[in-house]
A protein has these predicted regions:
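Conserved SAM/AdoMet-binding glycine-rich loop
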Residues: 1-97
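Rossmann-like AdoMet/SAM-dependent catalytic core
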Residues: 159-179, 184-281
Length: 286
């Protein structure tokens, strides 16, 4: 790791910042040193973003793919950079690695999700010609597509059915987490489950069971589908989630009227009417 080279590059882009251009860097977070992090702290918000390839937190998997990552150190660095509030972080996981089954991938997911990155990217192993993974494919029971990008179908640890389930979770994470349109709702909904992975797994199953994956959805429809899911599984908290969803909707959308899924709000109307009546009384001539 050439720290001097990295510092030279980052100093240059900071000194020549045009206020518009964004630079994307793929880094090993556990190798960042104090000087580099202190420099990041001084950068314009949005000047740089970091992509951090965690891939897995399963120790057996990490050893098998010859990585030296120390996840505890990665987590410490990610939290610290998060606290700066000026650098977006994208953390990556890869499904289909050796010794990674559905359950252990779920743990890797929860470990990374807890770090609250701006983006959590779920990828699937690509078995490139001449790579180490191709050499060990028989040992791993690794079956993958015969055409580029040679993506994994299943392994001796991860059956094809579970690969499909992870595909569904990938879609839910893209829609309900990475879009940043449902931040407050998903934080509240997570409290209803023993893990974030379980939450996205259940939501993915709901999409699959109702045929939603085969349909193109408007953004507003995503709110309605999520509320329908909540109505089915958390009926007693429907009113709470409707309000939080409405709040998220107004935060992200340039809405001129109350969304259909929010329904009528008689309480709001009473408060508005009372407010205007008070204003009229206050401004009326004596």
């Amino acid at each position: 790791c050439k720290h001097d080279h990295a510092m030279t590059v980052w100093h240059y882009i900071k000194e020549h910042d045009n206020g518009i251009t964004n630079f994307h860097f793929e880094v090993a977070a556990d190798l960042l040193n104090e000087e580099e992090m202190e420099l990041m702290k001084t950068m314009r918000p949005g000047l740089i973003q970091l992509e951090i390839g965690v891939q897995s937190t399963n120790l057996d998997t990490i050893r098998e793919i010859h990585r030296t990552m120390k996840f505890e150190q990665v987590a410490e660095v990610v939290r610290r950079i998060n606290s700066y509030g000026n650098v977006h972080q994208h953390l990556d996981l890869i499904a289909g690695l050796p010794y990674e089954d559905y359950e252990s991938f779920g743990k890797s997911f929860d470990d990374v999700y807890a770090l609250e990155p701006e983006q959590l990217q779920l990828g699937f192993l690509k078995v490139l010609k001449g790579s180490y993974m191709e050499e060990r494919k028989d040992d791993y029971g690794l079956v993958y597509k015969g055409m580029p990008p040679y993506e994994v179908l299943y392994t001796k640890w991860l059956p094809y059915e579970d690969t499909l389930r992870l595909k569904g979770i990938e879609e839910m994470v893209e829609v309900y987490y990475n879009s940043r349109q449902f931040t407050n709702t998903m934080e509240e909904l997570e409290k209803e489950y023993d893990s974030a992975f379980t939450m996205y797994d259940r939501l993915a199953s709901y999409y699959e069971d109702n045929g939603y994956n085969a349909v193109q959805h408007k953004r507003s429809a995503r709110y309605e589908i999520l509320l329908n899911y909540i109505r089915l599984h958390h009926k007693e908290k429907e009113d709470l989630f409707r309000e939080v969803l409405t709040y998220d909707y107004y935060l992200r959308e340039n809405a001129k009227s109350r969304p259909e899924f929010a329904g009528e709000d008689a309480t709001d109307k009473r408060f508005v009417r009372a407010f205007y009546e008070d204003c009229l009384l206050y401004t009326s001539p004596s």
